[in-house]
Amino acid sequence: MNKSAAVFKQIKENRLIAILAPKNTAECVGAYEILHPLGITLEIVFRSEIASSGIKAVLDKYPDALILAGTVMTGKLAEHAIEEGVAGVVSADYIPEVLEVCVFHDIMCVPGGLSDVGKQLVRKAELYGCEFEKLKEKYPYQWVYKLFPAVTATNSFFGIAKAWKGPYKGLNVFYTGGLSAENLGDILKSDPDGIFCGSALTKDIDNPEKMEEVAEKWLSIIYSKTN
């Protein structure tokens, strides 16, 4: 099982993905050490150069760590993140050059938005050289898309995710944007395949006990609604 298949399996099992915009590399290692034992996947976002060194620091200490690179908006940045050893790449939109780099390296690519879901799936199949209908079977970790935003101040877009699963059977839809512990229970009614919870789980990175407490609260909500 390659890294992308492994992180995809982890997300499917536990659903929760925590997002960290690190101020230093120690935060990346610390966040991983808190979240990993709980089964929560860590996404380190590329909003500064620290992200790259932070990913490297985690993987230097924990070579088998499954880390996602977030806010990857160029092919060059995707190459860099993959060189550092990430298991998957996440973008805020469908960016063809990012997707192309990911498929070339057989790394999970999770574009996001409220459209383009079909375009990115078709392009993935073309790049892998397989029939569209076989993409889900051969590369299940590429049969994904991120619903962004899932919630705004005035609307929710869960119905779009349900509609996508009509033509794209078994599509794995990960929700992000506007999610909180307060509305998580309602969100779970639409059965998301993964939940990017923003900085909610990492904002207390300087207080490990508090961070773990918040993470466990989110997990308890998920388990209570799905079991």
Each predicted region: which residue ranges?
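A general structural signal for short secondary-structure boundary/capping elements
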Residues: 65-68, 90-93, 113-119, 195-196, ...
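Hydrophobic secondary-structure block in the mid-to-C-terminal portion of proteins
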Residues: 159-225
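Conserved N-terminal beta1-alpha1 strand-loop-helix module at the mouth
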Residues: 1-85, 170, 181-182, 206-227
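Short amphipathic alpha-helical patches
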Residues: 58, 65, 104-105, 125-126, ...
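Conserved anion-binding
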Residues: 73-77, 84-184, 200
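Residues at the N-termini of beta-strands
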Residues: 41-42, 88, 144, 194
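Short acidic, S/G/P-rich loop/turn micro-motifs used as interaction or catalytic elements
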Residues: 25, 152, 203
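Well-formed, non-transmembrane alpha-helical positions, independent of function
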Residues: 34, 57, 80, 101, ...
